């Protein structure tokens, strides 16, 4: 009996069915593999759990997930996403899954060769067109000690438009930034507490670059570094798509790790798979460190420096000689007029230079320091009128970039091996510091006169009886020592808290919680040497004190030298304890550091202390490395 050959339509149907049956297990295997792939885990911000198997997403917004278990179930979230992006559009197409999550949609379709449904994402396409982005630039704003959120610096991304005739106005470009969504009435102390321990949602936002410059450069006096990223057009597209996915969605903000810099690293990891920048983060993400990691991954093509308004004004004043600076200060403060005899005695070029520098200073003070308009506006007008009748000096190129960028300074993690003598006993010691910089660290790449230490542990092992002790446990220690002059009069200040060894009248030394602070002034003597005068206050709390606590007002007079090869801090500090054990404590101290490049330093210190009618001589020698 002859075999019957199926008709063509039936044969096609059978073949399609057999292919579907054979493809289903393959797609199942593909989905299981994709659920733990690096790119999927990055897209949904999954990270391995530290103390158990599995993953947890750092996204804290339920709307970021399609699966109810999506926060901890990568495979379940992938399957739910595939179902969502494959469903037909109903209602507003802009609410469709592929429009809400275009980066996920594009990646999944590429991996599984899924057909594209007929869904038009008008809002997303209009948003991209409005941003008009050809390239991405990572921008680093230098540290700003007067704000807890910016003490370590700040990073954000600039979305650069296509160049038109080589003259693109980057001030009009947009930026991507991540920050804590804090209430306006929250104090800096509350902000610091909630930023450290949690409590603020973090929000990714898009805003114009000129607004960022106004805040960071013009008002907060922070220099900006611009790092052009060498992303391809496809990588730029992927970054924008993922920004659309996460903007206005909550990722809880933490000051030391899940901060502005951390979120931007995640965006770069999404744009260029395999960079694994987030793998560098352990306990904290310092913005300058994150920039260093980006540079080390060869992600940067060019670097540009944008000085702050204060840096530019200071540079203009520095071009004047001492007599011209005196005249500029007198003009700005209204002691002399623009047509006074001292000004008219100058030749045209010097007069123009003085008027230019004074005008820039007055305008800066009016904006950054809120000089009254009724004073600043008339004076600015008088300076402009006087200047308009003069031929200008050769155009100044403005301040030169620092020799060392912030990302080129020493690493922020420090480890030191020490040895010394505390007046009666010898010891060896170990110091560990999580971050960031102190006055005697190699200064290149850091703000002169600025100190910010976070989580520093000093330990000792005494050689006579092998007794181990914690000498200091510093939670946070900040010092801002900016020199004063005729134009700028910043307040020098310091604050810190933690635990430290305190000597009792019996001679015993106990670990005591403390809070300390101070305020005063700093004056530059030479380019590298400054004099400090600080009024201080200390609070110690301990059950070993007669009243459980003690308070000490005091003063600290010192000299500070910061140099690339050698740094020195020496002075006299005195404080009077007035509550529990009423007595005075005086200390003459000398601390120095020899810098062996930016990775190592040798430190030595010595002091002579008078405390409880006893004199003690202390010294310490150590080797410090930065990681």
Task: Annotate each language-model stretch with its function.
Residues 209-284, 540-542, 625:
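Active-site nucleophile-His-acid catalytic modules used for acyl/amide transfer and hydrolysis
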